[in-house]
């Protein structure tokens, strides 16, 4: 269970340029400030991840998301918070996890799964490789998590055309996405 003290420690760690392992609504993540080159390099090095491979920016409330057009904003409000990563125009991926305990975190977090690149998804803290746990500044234990990765949906053209594409199947069924994203296309 995440406490208020955990949330404060997390926000302090991330704000200060640190790297943290933390629970999300799907898997354990490892993250840092997206504007800290050193911290981003640490995250990628800990995972053994190729430097050019993208990572998502996690916000902990809808209010913290970047400005979008009205159609895209309505889609974000229908899908988030929840286990969906949305790719916006320009290729930026954003997430708002369904984590009420973390809702007061006001700093964005560059986040990726807390595993070695290509490794199994960590649903328990013990599943996070020791090399990652030992290489970060803060570790938060949220118990056992669902273990199903987030669904990734590309809304890059959604504002103009209403087109969307699932890039990775995951925790949210495609049928639910279709219901929400095709809503304004119906009569």
Task: Give each language-model segment a name.
Residues 1-187:
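Active-site-adjacent structural elements in enzyme catalytic cores
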